[in-house]
Structures are given as structure tokens and as C-alpha cells.
């Protein structure tokens, strides 16, 4: 039987196509299961999309199937995308947060996220103009430049101190 940790180690080598972070550190992997068969091992990966309709899902699925499928003893790989539990920035590992910071992307603090299982009505989510520390110089002299970034999960901030723009992940 193939080791679950070995599969996770392979999954750690797969980068998210839109951010400088592995899919494991981004918190996309919910579960990994292995079933033995006469022909080899069948690997089941359950993953969470950051957003419904994320255009990178097919690419990530192909990368998982390809990389894990190359492991000795693996007969087949099945990837299933689920929306429950919903992905949130709280799932990003500390190593992932550091990698994002090094590449100029900040991440909201963990906790205080909306629990969708306890909400019975539509709840408006506003994008606040709270100052975010600049990942380049550390200054708090920053401002929201645009709530719309290069992907649906990011927004653009501007640092008045070092005059750099940077991305910040939305708290979902």
C-alpha cells in the first residue's frame, strides 16, 4: 500500500497556477485516500476550490492526476472537487503565508470568518479599506487601490511609504 504522506509530499510539489504557493499550503487538499486493488493502488483526492468557477480547477486536476499517477504502485488517480466545507484563507499554512508575503501578496489573519453553516439568509460582505501592512517595507501607510485584483480572490493595495502596489487575498 502506498503511503499517504508520500502522496502529500508529491502534492506539495504542485504549485497553484495563479499564486506562488503549493496546493497543499494553499489548503486546497481536504482528504487523500488510498484503496488497494489487484492492479495497484487507487488514489482518491478530495479538494476544495477557492471559488466556485475558478478557471484553474481543470489544470490543478490534471497536475494532481499526472504527478500522483507517476508514483510507483499507483494504478489510477481520481480528483473530486467539493464545496463543503468551503475553502477559506484560514486554511493557508504558515509556510504558504510566508511564501505569499515574499511574493508581495498579503493574507488576512486567521479566524473571524463567516460560518456559512450558521447563516440562513444572504449576508452582504463588504471590502473594507483597512490598512494592511506592506509586504515590501512593513509600513501601515497603505490603502485599498481596487477591490478587484487579477483573480476573484485578490484585491490591490498601494503603499504610500515605498510606492509599491501589492495584492491582498480577500477574506472568504
Region spans (language model):
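Short, non-transmembrane amphipathic alpha-helical segments
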Residues: 50-76
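Short linker/helix segments within small regulatory modules
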Residues: 146-156
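Residues immediately within or flanking Cys/His clusters that coordinate Zn2+
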Residues: 131, 139, 156
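Short edge beta-strands and adjacent turn/loop segments
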Residues: 18-48
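Short cysteine-rich clusters marking metal-coordination/redox-active sites
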Residues: 134-137, 159-162
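Short functional micro-motifs and their immediate structural scaffolds
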Residues: 139-143, 167
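Short metal-binding segments enriched for Cys and/or His
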Residues: 161-172
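N-proximal, solvent-exposed amphipathic alpha-helical segments enriched in charged/polar residues
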Residues: 1-26
Amino acid at each position: 500500500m502506498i503511503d499517504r504522506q508520500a502522496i502529500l509530499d508529491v502534492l506539495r510539489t504542485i504549485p497553484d497556477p495563479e499564486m506562488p504557493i503549493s496546493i497543499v499550503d494553499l489548503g486546497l487538499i481536504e482528504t487523500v485516500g488510498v484503496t488497494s486493488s489487484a492492479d495497484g493502488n487507487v488514489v482518491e483526492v478530495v479538494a476544495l476550490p477557492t471559488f466556485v468557477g475558478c478557471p484553474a480547477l481543470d489544470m490543478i486536476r490534471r497536475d494532481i492526476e499526472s504527478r500522483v499517477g507517476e508514483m510507483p504502485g499507483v494504478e489510477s488517480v481520481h480528483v473530486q472537487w467539493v464545496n463543503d466545507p468551503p475553502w477559506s484563507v484560514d486554511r493557508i499554512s504558515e509556510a504558504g503565508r510566508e511564501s505569499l508575503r515574499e511574493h508581495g501578496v498579503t493574507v488576512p489573519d486567521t479566524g473571524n470568518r463567516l460560518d456559512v453553516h450558521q447563516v440562513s439568509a444572504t449576508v452582504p460582505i463588504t471590502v473594507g479599506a483597512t490598512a494592511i501592512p506592506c509586504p515590501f517595507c512593513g509600513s501601515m501607510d497603505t490603502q485599498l487601490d481596487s477591490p478587484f485584483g487579477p483573480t476573484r480572490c485578490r484585491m490591490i493595495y498601494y503603499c504610500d511609504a515605498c510606492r509599491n502596489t501589492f495584492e491582498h487575498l480577500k477574506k472568504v
